[in-house]
Amino acid sequence: MKLLILALCFAAASALTADQISTVQSSFAGVKGDAVGILYAVFKADPSIQAKFTQFAGKDLDSIKGSADFSAHANKIVGFFSKIIGDLPNIDGDVTTFVASHTPRGVTHDQLNNFRAGFVSYMKAHTDFAGAEAAWGATLDAFFGMVFAKM
């Protein structure tokens, strides 16, 4: 059954249209330079995600937002997300890498859903998201569907 779900998720990623991919890549290009803002929005939306990062666990989010460590880690996360966006629709390798690094950390489906919600909230506040919402929905459904099938 898990194999069937995984196959359907791969099909979903492959089913993204060229217009959807272009829309997602274009809208993300406008914000990917604000890695700190993106990670801040995600941590603010779900503090349990921040707690998974030992260097940030238990610290006041507003006080660490301007630190070099926070910036470096935000750039790493957003850089990987940029790679995924750039690789669309061929993201199987990215998903495998993501799952391999996040499963041992005990990341839950709920936390990933909350990461998604925080990211979407950020996008709504910083882009013309209404025009890209359907494309983002399809893209995030495909990515997280593949991740959940492998976790």
Swiss-Prot record:
Residues 1-15 form the signal peptide. One of its GO terms (molecular function) is heme binding. Gene3D superfamilies: Globins. Residues 16-151 form the Globin domain. CDD domains: Mb-like. It holds the Pfam family Globin. Keywords: Heme, Iron, Metal-binding, Oxygen transport, Signal, Transport. One of its GO terms (cellular component) is extracellular region. SUPFAM superfamilies: Globin-like. Heme b binds at residue 102. Belongs to the globin family. Monomer. There are at least 12 different components in Midge globin. This is Globin CTT-IV. It comes from Chironomus thummi thummi (Midge).
